Amino acid sequence: MTGGGFATSANGVEFEAKITPIVIISCIMAATGGLMFGYDVGVSGGVTSMPDFLEKFFPVVYRKVVAGADKDSNYCKYDNQGLQLFTSSLYLAGLTATFFASYTTRTLGRRLTMLIAGVFFIIGVALNAGAQDLAMLIAGRILLGCGVGFANQAVPLFLSEIAPTRIRGGLNILFQLNVTIGILFANLVNYGTAKIKGGWGWRLSLGLAGIPALLLTVGALLVTETPNSLVERGRLDEGKAVLRRIRGTDNVEPEFADLLEASRLAKEVKHPFRNLLQRRNRPQLVIAVALQIFQQCTGINAIMFYAPVLFSTLGFGSDASLYSAVVTGAVNVLSTLVSIYSVDKVGRRVLLLEAGVQMFFSQVVIAIILGVKVTDTSTNLSKGFAILVVVMICTYVAAFAWSWGPLGWLIPSETFPLETRSAGQSVTVCVNLLFTFIIAQAFLSMLCHFKFGIFIFFSAWVLIMSVFVMFLLPETKNIPIEEMTERVWKKHWFWARFMDDHNDHEFVNGEKSNGKSNGFDPSTRL
């Protein structure tokens, strides 16, 4: 059933904007890119705690963990650069692929870029599931990383451009919801396959990633391209036809004219990456980069990558480690649903600030428990304290899932102006994957050297990012994208200085630009 409504443009003209089934279905299908990403995040920690997997690819770690060799420290038994590379190589490949994905997103469209991501995922899954040596295993992870780079570039843009303004935040968070569902699915699979003997358990875990890979590929074939992308590539008749379909009305002429004007302004920018560095675009760039760095420095991916390994380090048995990872994965999914409901009601800042307090408290409590109860050679954490650690980790994961998880992607996608949005999204994904790689590659070594202090380290970052949000992050709830300059940046106590009138008339490629697109942007109307 469609929902009716109107969206108001910057010049006061109202455009009819219905929430049509095709929009909802397209957003759901596109968001399956997050399902694949989430499965890759969740599966690595589970298989790296499986004895058969360690024995085949990482015999040194296997001897320390399973055979009982090297009793030096519980915190250090998984400290192995090769093991960390298995996890982190995906994100380094994704970082590289993002540069190519920016080009394909702009020239081939969002839909075809998602299809390319699906193909990379399928080939990578096949190599991982059939891996005979470490080189083949890493090659598969690299191809999966290429898929991540293409999917993370195209999907958030697709969702922002096709979603109606009043539910833009909720629909955009479908991507993050699918990430959390993918993590939970991977944890459940790992819990089941860990009981399979003969070396097939880890192969099944890695091979079942083919399910979300196929969903993304089929979804990319079924969804409609955004009108923004079609007009941008000169396919005007198709763009108008799609606009009618996703609107559920023939009354699209005024809106289509606005879309043409927005596309014209965007095409005048010949060097979008260079334009990102111009003074009027610095606030959006700083916010986007900072959010990606802070998102990773919460420590969430370290926990999601290595949850079973982490629980094993803390003295949990093998089954208990995998089961605890399933519990945290379920909390992750449910809490993301909270974000979908609340992000367009209470706003972005409230969610981020509340979560900062909750994450800081949880990590400090975990650090205290581990500092007192877990030594280098202790074999088991008592049941009461083990439950408390799991509860605190779940409290921490819940806070992240309704704040920094989805909003780290949503806010950059809605704050960049149209003429620099593709480049801005590319920078956003690059920074995110770079710091994801750093954390994934360093976490087990940091755990070995910092011990319980690793949680103090991440809690300090949570404090810093909360202060940043309090003073420097403006609220963007229910504000059309093309009005961000006037209603957000020019009214902010700090960022307004970058929006001075004399900067509004800088020349961009021979044309005057006021740093604000008055044309139509699909993400604010559909």
Curated annotation (Swiss-Prot):
Q: Which GO terms describe its biological process?
A: monosaccharide transmembrane transport; response to abscisic acid; response to salt stress; response to water deprivation
Q: How does it sit in the membrane?
A: Multi-pass membrane protein
What is the name listed in the Swiss-Prot or TrEMBL entry for this protein? Sugar transport protein 13
Q: What does this protein do?
A: Mediates an active uptake of hexoses, probably by sugar/hydrogen symport.
Q: Which GO terms describe its cellular component?
A: plasma membrane; plasmodesma; plastid
Keyword Repeat assigned:
no
Residues exposed to the Cytoplasmic side: 1-18, 103-111, 163-168, 225-296, 341-349, 405-426, 473-526
Q: Where are the transmembrane segments?
A: 19-39, 82-102, 112-132, 142-162, 169-189, 204-224, 297-317, 320-340, 350-370, 384-404, 427-447, 452-472
Q: Print the keywords alphabetically.
A: Cell membrane, Membrane, Sugar transport, Symport, Transmembrane, Transmembrane helix, Transport
Q: Does the keyword Transmembrane helix apply?
A: yes
Stretches assigned to the Extracellular side:
40-81, 133-141, 190-203, 318-319, 371-383, 448-451
Q: Which organism is it from?
A: Arabidopsis thaliana (Mouse-ear cress)
| One MF term in the entry's GO annotations | high-affinity D-glucose:proton symporter activity
Q: Which family does it belong to?
A: Belongs to the major facilitator superfamily. Sugar transporter (TC 2.A.1.1) family.
Q: What NCBIfam families does UniProt report for this protein, alphabetically?
A: SP
Q: Where in the cell is it found?
A: Cell membrane
